[in-house]
Amino acid sequence: MPIKSRIRTVPDYPKKGIMFRDITTLIKDPVGFRLVIDNMTQHYLSNGVDFDAIVGIESRGFILGGALAYTLGKGFVPVRKPGKLPADVVQLEYELEYGTDKIEMHTDALVQGQRVLLVDDLLATGGTALAAAGLVEKLGGVVASMAFIVNLPDIGGEKKIREKGYNIYFLTEFEGD
């Protein structure tokens, strides 16, 4: 059974008209979770993208990022919501569909020129991923690639991220449904 068929679709969540792609059904399945990690690991071992650390976006990016960091032998750096990191942080505010939000990283999380793989579960508008990339760059890091389990191409995040020059990899997509 492929990855896409293991992802539950929840209609009208979190609001009417939204088709929510729920990866919890994928990652609770040991075969499904292994497929995700093995496919991403193989992709990054074989495609020549060079990076030193994995940056995971709260919260589902922690699940994916932690497992990938382990299998690839890399360190893991969390991107968190405000007030969740105990030491000095760098913060970035970004636009949402209705308002703004903020994310943070420790100021000592990366060193100048350090190359990272940025990971999250799902790419929709691209706002959070671009904000996380902004934090990486604010700290002097370089985003070597971005990886997602799911891409929702109709929402436009992939196009927006590619236009900014970032490399993207995803395992499956839900187009027009």
Swiss-Prot record:
Keyword Transferase: yes
Catalytic reaction(s) noted: AMP + diphosphate = 5-phospho-alpha-D-ribose 1-diphosphate + adenine
Any one GO molecular function term: adenine phosphoribosyltransferase activity
InterPro entries: Ade_phspho_trans, PRibTrfase_dom, PRTase-like, UPRTase/APRTase
UniProt KW keywords: Cytoplasm, Glycosyltransferase, Purine salvage, Transferase
GO annotation, cellular component aspect: cytoplasm
GO biological process annotation, one example: adenine salvage
Major site of localization recorded for this protein: cytoplasm
Compartmental location: Cytoplasm
Biochemical pathway: Purine metabolism; AMP biosynthesis via salvage pathway; AMP from adenine: step 1/1
CDD domains in alphabetical order: PRTases_typeI
Family label: Belongs to the purine/pyrimidine phosphoribosyltransferase family.
Protein's job: Catalyzes a salvage reaction resulting in the formation of AMP, that is energically less costly than de novo synthesis.
Description of how the protein assembles with itself and partners: Homodimer.
Name of this protein: Adenine phosphoribosyltransferase
